[in-house]
Amino acid sequence: MTRIISWGAAVLATALVVTAASARLRAQGATINKRTFLTFSAPVQVPGATLPAGTYVFRIANPAVQTVWQVFDANERHLLAQFFFVPTGDRTIQEQNRAHGKPVVRFHETPRGVAPPMNVLYYPTNPAGYVFLYPRAQAEQIAALTHQPVLATDSDPTKSSLAHVMTV
């Protein structure tokens, strides 16, 4: 018995398969580059920039290397900051469970009126966090305000995928 499928049905089936496959790839891409939307109600500092209140997209610049975060506006049209990070494993299972699948940000404590600098970002599905490396001058300012050590670098993430890490 020979089955004849109309061209319309074949095109529809192909379109459904392509749509499903592309949706799956987009979902995997968000996991690979750790694409995360964060909304802040007040200004915050990231390495190399102070972000006004608003929504931002944080993502890994190169998933193959995973040493640099990028921060974009909510529409991902403008790159606002690009900086190195180092992994940290200081989050407990209980903390991960309390996050309920949402990203968690830890800030350096600063005096009132000073935009708090982001210290660690925990991606929802990863028990390890990402400690942000601040440019040396900015790290020295943060350390002076917080009286705490701050991880810093004198490396440029636009020129290298490797960072020289120091504590100030």
What is each of the regions a protein language model found here?
Residues 27-45:
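Short acidic, Pro/Gly- and aromatic-enriched capping/linker segments at domain boundaries
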Residues 1-11:
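Bacterial N-terminal signal peptides that target proteins for export
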Residues 66-120:
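Mid-chain, structured segments of secreted extracytoplasmic proteins
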Residues 21-27:
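Sec/Tat signal peptide C-region and signal peptidase I cleavage site
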